[in-house]
């Protein structure tokens, strides 16, 4: 078997996941991409990873909302590359509404994708990591895994949940060369954030500009969105041996938000 490590990144066809895919490809890893964009949108991204970094990149359309999809993504990576060394649980969605109007199906979808998918992928990826005595699991949580905001009940519940899952699995595998950490970004300018601005504006009776300035960046003392490149740099570091003692941590990348 080749020494080249394989990274599986859920939701890596856009935003933070795509940034992570670039960061880990730049570190020399083969990449299993995943996401719901069309094949025509994904193929240039996949090819660009191979061309820019000289690694192999494959793509799976597995739906992380479904347990079989999450398990299937790990199986696809194992049958393509023979190993999963790094797992980044990143795919996530948002829905904004007061709790009493929050649709039941949106609650369930957010719990399934933002929390349960990481349970199924972790379960499927751990046996191989244990066998090799090395592994990295990085869960993309959120500042909302540490603190709450109104109108995001499902998202905040799922993100607090994934921080709990991170700590629990970290303890279970601590002696086996596997680290498990959560990255907790504040606001990062990606399609997910862009899409929630109209709904937040409606829920709070504000203009979209007011939402950006007075709601999103009001919480972020730096008054700047974090970048996907900053998150990828942390992801890269967590995959080095220098980060071997960082495990069970929830690491904020939030411009000081959770220091309040
Ligand atoms: P994004 O909307 O840009 O990308 C989401 C990715 O997930 C896409 O590749 C999409 O295809 C994929 N996806 C969506 N549903 C899927 C499904 N059912 N199965 C497989 N893939 C699916 O979002 P983003 O802003 O890059 O967010 C990525 C993660 O970072 C999410 O978990 C989000 O909660 C978290 N996060 C984002 C921010 C931010 O400000 N953008 C802040 C904190 C945490």
Question: Residue spans of the language-model regions?
Answer:
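Conserved glycine-rich cofactor-binding loop
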Residues: 13-15
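Substrate-binding pocket helix/loop in short-chain dehydrogenase/reductase
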Residues: 98-99, 106-111, 137, 216
């Amino acid at each position: 078997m080749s020494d080249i490590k394989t990274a599986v990144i859920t939701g890596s066809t856009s935003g933070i996941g795509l940034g992570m895919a670039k960061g880990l490809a730049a570190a020399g890893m083969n990449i299993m991409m995943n996401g719901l964009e069309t094949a025509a949108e994904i193929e240039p991204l996949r090819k660009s990873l191979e061309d820019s970094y000289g690694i192999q990149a494959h793509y799976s359309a597995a739906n992380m909302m479904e347990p079989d999809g999450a398990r299937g993504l790990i199986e696809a990576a194992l049958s393509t590359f023979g190993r999963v060394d790094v797992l980044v649980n990143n795919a996530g969605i948002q829905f904004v509404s007061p709790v009493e109007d929050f649709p039941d199906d949106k609650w369930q979808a957010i719990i399934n994708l933002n929390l349960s998918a990481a349970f199924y992928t972790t379960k499927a990826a751990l046996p191989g990591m244990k066998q090799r005595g090395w592994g990295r699991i990085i869960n993309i949580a959120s500042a909302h895994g540490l603190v709450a905001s109104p109108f995001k009940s499902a998202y905040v519940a799922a993100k607090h949940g994934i921080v709990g899952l991170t700590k629990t699995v970290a303890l279970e595998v601590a002696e086996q060369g596997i680290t498990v950490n959560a990255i907790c970004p504040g606001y990062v300018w990606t399609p997910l954030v862009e899409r929630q601005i109209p709904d937040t504006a409606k829920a709070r009776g504000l203009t979209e500009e007011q939402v950006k300035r007075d709601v999103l960046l009001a919480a972020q003392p730096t008054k700047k969105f974090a970048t996907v490149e900053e998150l990828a740099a942390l992801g890269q570091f967590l995959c080095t041996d220098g980060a071997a003692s960082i495990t069970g941590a929830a690491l904020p990348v939030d411009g000081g938000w959770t220091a309040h």
